[in-house]
């Protein structure tokens, strides 16, 4: 049973990866170009998440102070 569930999960992840390749047109690139693109994408998303994690609390507190919700 666990083997079947694992195979099904693997098939689903393969389908999502295939869809990602088609939507972003990465299937036309060579493997090294695909690696460069994916590395840059992961870097940009990582920096965006980090920036949101670091600066969002400050901005939220500034908004709350501006509308006098928090003193």
From Swiss-Prot:
Domain of life from the UniProt record: Eukaryota
GO molecular-function terms, A-Z: serine C-palmitoyltransferase activity
GO BP: ceramide biosynthetic process; protein localization; sphingosine biosynthetic process
TM segment ranges: 13-29, 35-57
Subcellular location: Endoplasmic reticulum membrane
The keyword Transmembrane helix belongs to this UniProt entry's keyword annotation: yes
Membrane topology: Multi-pass membrane protein
Lumenal face residues: 30-34
Pathway: Lipid metabolism; sphingolipid metabolism
Keyword Transferase: no
Record's function text: Component of the serine palmitoyltransferase multisubunit enzyme (SPT) that catalyzes the initial and rate-limiting step in sphingolipid biosynthesis by condensing L-serine and activated acyl-CoA (most commonly palmitoyl-CoA) to form long-chain bases. The SPT complex is composed of SPTLC1, SPTLC2 or SPTLC3 and SPTSSA or SPTSSB. Within this complex, the heterodimer consisting of SPTLC1 and SPTLC2/SPTLC3 forms the catalytic core. Within the SPT complex, SPTSSA stimulates the catalytic activity and plays a role in substrate specificity, which depends upon the overall complex composition.
Subunit structure: Component of the serine palmitoyltransferase (SPT) complex, which is composed of SPTLC1, SPTLC2 or SPTLC3 and SPTSSA or SPTSSB. The heterodimer consisting of SPTLC1 and SPTLC2/SPTLC3 forms the catalytic core of the enzyme, while SPTSSA or SPTSSB subunits determine substrate specificity. SPT also interacts with ORMDL proteins, especially ORMDL3, which negatively regulate SPT activity in the presence of ceramides. Interacts with MBOAT7; the interaction plays a role in MBOAT7 localization to mitochondria-associated membranes.
Protein name, as recorded: Serine palmitoyltransferase small subunit A
Organism name: Rattus norvegicus (Rat)
Gene name linked to the record: Sptssa
């Amino acid at each position: 049973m666990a083997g079947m569930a694992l195979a099904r999960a693997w098939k689903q992840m393969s389908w999502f990866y295939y869809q990602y390749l088609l939507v972003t047109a990465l299937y036309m690139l060579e493997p090294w170009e695909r690696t460069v693109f994916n590395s840059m994408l992961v870097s940009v998303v990582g920096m965006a998440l980090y920036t949101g994690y670091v600066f969002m609390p400050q901005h939220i507190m500034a908004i709350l102070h501006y509308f006098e919700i928090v003193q």
